[in-house]
Amino acid sequence: MYKRPLLCIVLVIFMLACNLPSHAPNSNPRLLATLQASTPLAVFTAAPVPPVLPASTEPTGRIALTCQIFKEESKEQICIVNADGSGYRRLTTGDELRHYYASVAPDGQSVVYSAYNTQTEHFEIYELHLLTNETKMLTNHFGDLNAPEISPDGKTIVFTRYYLDVAKPTTWLMDRDGTNLRQVVDLVAWDPTWSPDGSAILFASDMKQTSQLFIVNVDGTDLRQVGDFPFLRGRSDWSSQNLIVTYSGIRWERELYSMNSDGSGQQRISPIGGNSQGPSFSPDGQWIAFTSYFDRYEVHGCEIYIMRVDGTDLRRLTDNEYCDYQPRWGP
């Protein structure tokens, strides 16, 4: 079994503490953190009013998410729900694993995710086929791997890799079957997502001291920063309409922001006061799913909400006694 330096472990926790509910009972300190919580604050800064967009149709498709089915033990599973809130069900069955970062394939037939094995103490990437529930482990001790996402053409998976002996997140690619692993760019980079045409990758990095978003071509060329945020966290998305959505803010003051893919037009879009985070666009680019605490401001209060891309028509999608978070929208 690998033994990791204490400093390495601490750095991994710091970099991955972007999205987990706080105060998870008896949680292993090396596990992913996804929705940090703290004391809500009452003072907020006004934001520009988003432009009014044409009304879209009702949301369609399905949203995969992390669900704390066993609240007290905090054993995270992967669940899925229809875009109208119906059909909520658990997908994963391995109670010895803790599951995170689900993402629906572009064809809607499968879900990829990262899972932590409490026995081997490693994160691996899996793919689960929705029709058969057949699950395949795609990686094997290549480091601690998370945030997998399938390319628009369905052939490639981008993901974050933490080396086993160095707490440095990097962005990698592999073929759909888990072979042909290669690094995109030799930089600190986490929470990657694809451009609509699959030619570029959006990711978060602190290469310039503060965490910001960057875009790079799949071949590692043309690296550039997009947007400028004071407290960027990580999990972002890039829509079919060429908009980028992300979240920024200190604990319990996080809000969603959208901008054009060149970084222009940056503005807050989430209703104030929900501690909103982890956004994901609908396939048509007209809606956003995200995690928030609008209705229950406490450690197990995070639920999945959706809204239109201009921040209107807020709807609560899940309603459970445990946390639902890390949504990713698919067809």
What is the role of each PLM region?
Residues 2-3, 12, 18-331:
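Sequence signature of WD/YWTD-type beta-propeller architectures
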